[in-house]
Amino acid sequence: MQIKEVQEKLKISSYTLRYYEKMGLIQPYRDENGYRNYSEEDIHKIERIMFLRDINVPIEDIKDILNNKVTFQDVLESHIQKVNTEIESLQYIKKHV
């Protein structure tokens, strides 16, 4: 699947796809003309990346998940703790404003 098809299927910009590639999150196959070709595995990986970015998981943490340095569950639990801390902080500020 070429970049244009991935853009349409996943509603993602070519800039974002290239950024994910630059950051080492995905490595699409390049054909003899240099065009990027994405496999179904790449598509699933991009969907996971998009989900994690939607919930503000940092790129470095996503790299660790994809490279099996940490589990998906560990990163999500850590992220939930950070979000809960942020919520508590915002509630405190709201209470004292």
Residues covered by each model-derived region:
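Short, charged amphipathic alpha-helical surface segments
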Residues: D31, M50, I55, D61-V97
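Basic helix-turn-helix/winged-helix DNA-binding cores
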Residues: M1-E60
